[in-house]
């Protein structure tokens, strides 16, 4: 069983605890190829490409220029600790025990516009490059063209190594589009998290993103190995709603957001 999540734009660049291991990228050479092309952009190009303010464009231009691979280990940080958006606030990996981080290293994968597919403890450098960015590159018109079937092939390899045929999709549509579903050797289950509002259950983006991280945390804390056990997920008041769910779309609801 593998869980898939999106990365985050917000980053925590404070140093990670030294005792937490750092692992190597699967797609380091591909990331370098992509970054070599991104380095050709000036600050104005970065602003236009990524729809950023001048300040953020300057920051990311500088990140591109400073990026070198292989990394200097002192400057890289584990992906799951670097990202700090809503999903990662729910996951709160920094408070997990070693056994729980080990579970995530086996079962959690992070999709990335620059790095393709990350294990949680892969050391990476700070960056911003969303998967939906329309960046013309040597392989085509955008990042979906750049990554092609590489991400899907690696997922298939890692699922086979686990002897599993189940993928839990906790990623956004923008990122999951980088996975070629028809070529994935897995059953895909997509949890949805809905809150009661104005007389009906609705997906509220902030809460849903946080809940995706909470579900990954729940799986790690409880060392979940059977997919059906995810239906017992109950963090932050969510409960599985069988009447709203289908075989592949599992809906979790709660009456009141915290």
From Swiss-Prot:
Q: Which InterPro entries match?
A: YaaA
Report the superkingdom from the record: Bacteria
GO biological-process terms attached to the record: response to hydroperoxide
| GO CC field | cytosol
**Family listed:** Belongs to the UPF0246 family.
PANTHER family linked: PEROXIDE STRESS RESISTANCE PROTEIN YAAA (PTHR30283:SF4), PEROXIDE STRESS RESPONSE PROTEIN YAAA (PTHR30283)
NCBIfam families, per this entry?
Answer: PRK02101.1-3
Q: Per its record, how is this protein called by name?
A: UPF0246 protein Tcr_1650
Q: Which organism is it from?
A: Hydrogenovibrio crunogenus (strain DSM 25203 / XCL-2)
């Amino acid at each position: 069983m593998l869980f898939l999540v999106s990365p985050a734009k917000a980053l925590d660049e404070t140093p990670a605890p030294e005792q937490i291991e750092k692992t190597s990228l699967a797609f380091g050479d591909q990331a370098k190829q992509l970054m070599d092309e991104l380095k050709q952009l000036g600050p104005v190009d970065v602003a236009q490409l990524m729809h950023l303010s001048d300040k953020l464009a300057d920051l990311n231009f500088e990140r591109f220029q400073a990026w070198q691979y292989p990394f200097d280990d002192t400057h890289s940080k584990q992906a799951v600790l670097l990202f700090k958006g809503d999903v990662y606030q729910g996951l709160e990996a920094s408070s997990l025990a070693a056994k729980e981080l080990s579970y995530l290293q086996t079962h959690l994968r992070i999709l990335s516009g620059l790095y393709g597919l990350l294990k949680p403890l892969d050391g990476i450098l700070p960056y911003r490059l969303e998967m939906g960015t329309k960046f013309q590159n040597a392989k085509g018109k955008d990042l979906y063209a750049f990554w092609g079937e590489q991400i899907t092939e690696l997922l298939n390899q890692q699922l086979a190594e686990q002897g599993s045929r189940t993928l839990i999709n906790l990623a956004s549509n923008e990122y999951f589009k980088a996975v070629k579903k028809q070529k994935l050797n897995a059953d895909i289950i997509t949890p949805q998290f809905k809150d009661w509002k104005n007389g009906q259950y609705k997906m509220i983006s902030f809460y849903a993103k946080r809940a995706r991280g909470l579900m990954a945390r729940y799986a790690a804390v409880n060392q979940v190995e059977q997919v059906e056990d995810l239906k017992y997920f109950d963090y932050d008041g969510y409960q599985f709603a069988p009447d709203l769910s289908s075989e592949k779309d599992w809906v979790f609801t709660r009456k009141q957001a915290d």
